[in-house]
């Protein structure tokens, strides 16, 4: 065999090896491409905002609950009840006439909020079914308690709604109603209802925080501070005036004051 033939036969083996290496490398790149395509498709089809929001709320709830020695379990309804058991001081069990006649009780005073003694800003928002609810209709010739909460991913927020739902019959005896508002979408609230059960008053979606900002509970981002959402509880009288209000980092749980 000539030297040229020998050289050619030796070079044929590395060429095949390179071909296989190229095929394996290209196959690997193909797998990676498909993997990232699947991830991209998932995030386009199902945006992560709701999950991210819930994660942030759960962390915020965890920090607040730790102040009371409570450890979150991930079960929002269970954690909400645990928060109520520790934080809520007034548990209403007597009849309404007895509660209202209690002269020893000192109700919490209203904060000096901007809306105090002003006409309540009207709103039209969707409930968990997608139906539109309007404050001027809900509160026509009747008192309304308007509650702003951070969403159903927040156990201490849900605690306030649980407490109000438990005492709802007292408010109904006074011909008053309750409406709760958060940035949760109607679909998200509906999913939570299926998991944990419904409340017996309207729970509305203020997805863009427009209503929350008008009521002074949502503070948009500025150059100095990030955006922030407070809890807010307001009493609207029969004439549509805001006669009492509370805004803060934790929910207002003294239902006796609201009566």
PLM features: what roles do these ranges have?
Residues 2-119:
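N-terminal targeting signals for export/organelle localization
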Residues 124-125, 235:
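Hydrophobic beta-strand positions
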Residues 133-164, 177:
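Short active-site neighborhood of thiol/selenol oxidoreductases, capturing the structured segment around
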Residues 159-213:
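Structural microenvironment flanking redox-active thiols in thiol-disulfide oxidoreductases
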Residues 198-202, 219-234:
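Structural micro-motif
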Residues 227-259:
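Thiol-/selenol-based redox modules, centered on thioredoxin-like
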């Amino acid at each position: 065999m000539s030297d040229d033939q020998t050289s050619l036969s030796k070079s044929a083996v590395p060429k095949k090896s390179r071909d296989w290496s190229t095929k394996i490398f290209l196959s690997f790149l193909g797998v990676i491409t498909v993997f990232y395509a699947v991830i991209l498709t998932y995030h386009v089809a199902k945006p992560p905002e709701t999950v991210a929001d819930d994660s942030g709320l759960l962390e915020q709830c965890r920090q607040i609950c730790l102040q009371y020695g409570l450890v979150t379990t991930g079960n929002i309804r269970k954690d909400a009840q645990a928060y109520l058991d520790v934080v809520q001081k007034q548990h209403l069990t007597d009849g309404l006439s007895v509660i209202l006649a209690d002269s020893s009780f000192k109700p919490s005073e209203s904060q000096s909020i901007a809306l105090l003694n002003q006409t309540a800003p009207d709103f039209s928002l969707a409930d968990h079914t997608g139906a539109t609810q309007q404050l001027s209709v809900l509160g026509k010739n009747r008192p309304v308690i308007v509650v702003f909460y951070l969403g159903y991913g927040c156990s201490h927020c849900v605690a306030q709604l649980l407490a109000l739902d438990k005492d709802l019959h007292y408010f109904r005896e006074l011909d008053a109603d309750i409406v709760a508002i958060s940035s949760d979408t109607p679909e998200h609230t509906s999913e939570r209802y299926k998991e944990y059960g419904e409340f017996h008053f309207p729970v509305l979606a203020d997805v863009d925080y427009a209503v929350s900002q008008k009521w002074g509970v949502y503070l948009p981002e500025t150059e100095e501070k990030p955006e922030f959402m407070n809890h807010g509880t307001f009493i609207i009288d029969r004439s549509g005036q805001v006669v009492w209000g509370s805004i803060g980092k934790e929910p207002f749980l003294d239902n006796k004051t609201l009566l």
